[in-house]
Amino acid sequence: MHDDQCFYCAQPLPTSWEVDHIIPWTRHPNDAIENLVPADRRCNGAKSDSLPAIGHIARWAEQLTTRRGDLAALVKSTGWVSDQAHTRAVVRSTYRHLAEGTPLWAAVNRNESFARESWSRLLSDQAESHRAADR
Protein backbone atom coordinates (compact mmCIF):
# COMPACT_ATOMS: atom_id res chain seq x y z
CA MET A 1 0.00 0.00 0.00
CA HIS A 2 2.87 2.41 0.70
CA ASP A 3 5.34 1.09 -1.90
CA ASP A 4 7.71 -0.29 0.76
CA GLN A 5 8.54 3.23 1.94
CA CYS A 6 8.31 4.92 5.29
CA PHE A 7 5.09 6.93 5.17
CA TYR A 8 6.76 9.96 6.74
CA CYS A 9 10.18 10.28 5.07
CA ALA A 10 9.60 8.15 1.91
CA GLN A 11 12.87 6.28 2.46
CA PRO A 12 12.86 2.54 1.70
CA LEU A 13 11.67 0.54 4.67
CA PRO A 14 14.32 -1.57 6.35
CA THR A 15 13.74 -5.29 6.85
CA SER A 16 12.57 -4.52 10.36
CA TRP A 17 10.03 -1.69 10.16
CA GLU A 18 7.33 -0.42 12.48
CA VAL A 19 3.67 0.50 12.32
CA ASP A 20 2.65 3.97 13.46
CA HIS A 21 -0.78 5.21 14.46
CA ILE A 22 -1.51 8.39 12.46
CA ILE A 23 -3.63 9.60 15.37
CA PRO A 24 -1.58 8.41 18.33
CA TRP A 25 -3.06 5.68 20.49
CA THR A 26 -2.59 7.96 23.51
CA ARG A 27 -5.04 10.46 21.98
CA HIS A 28 -7.59 7.99 20.65
CA PRO A 29 -7.23 4.18 20.86
CA ASN A 30 -7.95 3.23 17.25
CA ASP A 31 -6.34 0.16 15.72
CA ALA A 32 -8.34 0.32 12.47
CA ILE A 33 -6.09 -0.30 9.49
CA GLU A 34 -6.84 3.20 8.19
CA ASN A 35 -5.09 4.67 11.26
CA LEU A 36 -1.90 2.67 10.66
CA VAL A 37 1.04 3.48 8.40
CA PRO A 38 4.47 1.88 7.90
CA ALA A 39 7.33 3.83 9.42
CA ASP A 40 11.02 3.37 9.92
CA ARG A 41 12.21 3.28 13.52
CA ARG A 42 13.74 6.76 13.36
CA CYS A 43 10.53 8.48 12.20
CA ASN A 44 8.24 6.44 14.42
CA GLY A 45 10.39 7.14 17.47
CA ALA A 46 10.68 10.84 16.68
CA LYS A 47 6.95 11.25 16.06
CA SER A 48 6.11 9.30 19.21
CA ASP A 49 2.68 10.48 20.38
CA SER A 50 2.68 13.73 18.39
CA LEU A 51 0.06 14.61 15.83
CA PRO A 52 1.40 14.66 12.27
CA ALA A 53 1.67 17.85 10.23
CA ILE A 54 -1.12 18.73 7.83
CA GLY A 55 0.97 17.61 4.83
CA HIS A 56 1.12 14.07 6.24
CA ILE A 57 -2.63 14.12 6.90
CA ALA A 58 -3.30 15.31 3.34
CA ARG A 59 -1.19 12.48 1.88
CA TRP A 60 -2.84 9.94 4.22
CA ALA A 61 -6.34 11.07 3.18
CA GLU A 62 -5.40 10.95 -0.51
CA GLN A 63 -4.07 7.40 -0.16
CA LEU A 64 -7.26 6.26 1.56
CA THR A 65 -9.13 7.37 -1.56
CA THR A 66 -6.71 6.48 -4.37
CA ARG A 67 -5.62 3.15 -2.92
CA ARG A 68 -9.01 1.96 -1.73
CA GLY A 69 -8.63 -1.36 -3.59
CA ASP A 70 -5.18 -2.06 -2.12
CA LEU A 71 -6.51 -1.36 1.36
CA ALA A 72 -9.52 -3.64 0.84
CA ALA A 73 -7.23 -6.46 -0.35
CA LEU A 74 -4.99 -5.99 2.69
CA VAL A 75 -7.99 -6.12 5.02
CA LYS A 76 -9.25 -9.26 3.30
CA SER A 77 -5.87 -11.02 3.44
CA THR A 78 -5.09 -10.09 7.05
CA GLY A 79 -8.52 -9.90 8.65
CA TRP A 80 -7.53 -6.55 10.17
CA VAL A 81 -10.28 -4.26 11.44
CA SER A 82 -11.31 -1.59 8.95
CA ASP A 83 -13.35 1.49 9.82
CA GLN A 84 -12.57 4.29 7.42
CA ALA A 85 -15.55 6.47 8.35
CA HIS A 86 -14.70 6.35 12.05
CA THR A 87 -10.99 6.99 11.46
CA ARG A 88 -11.68 9.99 9.21
CA ALA A 89 -14.10 11.34 11.84
CA VAL A 90 -11.46 10.96 14.57
CA VAL A 91 -8.93 12.86 12.45
CA ARG A 92 -11.40 15.66 11.66
CA SER A 93 -12.46 15.98 15.31
CA THR A 94 -8.90 15.90 16.63
CA TYR A 95 -7.65 18.67 14.34
CA ARG A 96 -10.86 20.71 14.58
CA HIS A 97 -10.23 21.22 18.29
CA LEU A 98 -6.54 22.15 18.08
CA ALA A 99 -5.46 25.61 19.13
CA GLU A 100 -3.81 27.79 16.49
CA GLY A 101 -0.04 27.29 16.71
CA THR A 102 -0.14 23.80 18.27
CA PRO A 103 3.10 21.99 17.30
CA LEU A 104 2.60 19.20 14.75
CA TRP A 105 5.30 16.67 13.87
CA ALA A 106 6.67 17.20 10.35
CA ALA A 107 9.97 15.27 10.37
CA VAL A 108 12.78 14.21 12.66
CA ASN A 109 13.78 17.34 14.60
CA ARG A 110 11.18 19.49 12.81
CA ASN A 111 7.72 20.59 13.92
CA GLU A 112 5.23 22.86 12.20
CA SER A 113 2.61 25.04 13.84
CA PHE A 114 -1.04 24.19 13.31
CA ALA A 115 -2.74 26.76 11.08
CA ARG A 116 -6.53 26.60 10.94
CA GLU A 117 -6.45 28.06 7.42
CA SER A 118 -4.39 25.10 6.12
CA TRP A 119 -6.73 22.66 7.86
CA SER A 120 -9.84 24.32 6.38
CA ARG A 121 -8.28 24.26 2.91
CA LEU A 122 -7.48 20.54 3.29
CA LEU A 123 -11.08 19.78 4.33
CA SER A 124 -12.44 21.67 1.33
CA ASP A 125 -10.03 19.93 -1.06
CA GLN A 126 -11.07 16.55 0.37
CA ALA A 127 -14.76 17.36 -0.02
CA GLU A 128 -14.16 18.29 -3.67
CA SER A 129 -12.20 15.05 -4.25
CA HIS A 130 -15.02 12.98 -2.77
CA ARG A 131 -17.61 14.74 -4.96
CA ALA A 132 -15.47 14.10 -8.05
CA ALA A 133 -15.02 10.42 -7.11
CA ASP A 134 -18.78 10.02 -6.69
CA ARG A 135 -19.53 11.33 -10.22
Spell out what each predicted region is.
Residues 3-5, 44, 132-135:
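Long C-terminal interaction/binding lobes of large macromolecular proteins
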Residues 51-135:
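Extended charged
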Residues 44-47, 75:
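Short leucine-rich amphipathic alpha-helical surface patches
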Residues 41:
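Gly/Ser/Thr-rich active-site loops/lids in small-molecule metabolic enzymes
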Residues 7-38, 47-62:
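Histidine-centered nuclease catalytic patch
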Residues 2, 19-20, 87:
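Short amphipathic alpha-helical surface micro-motifs
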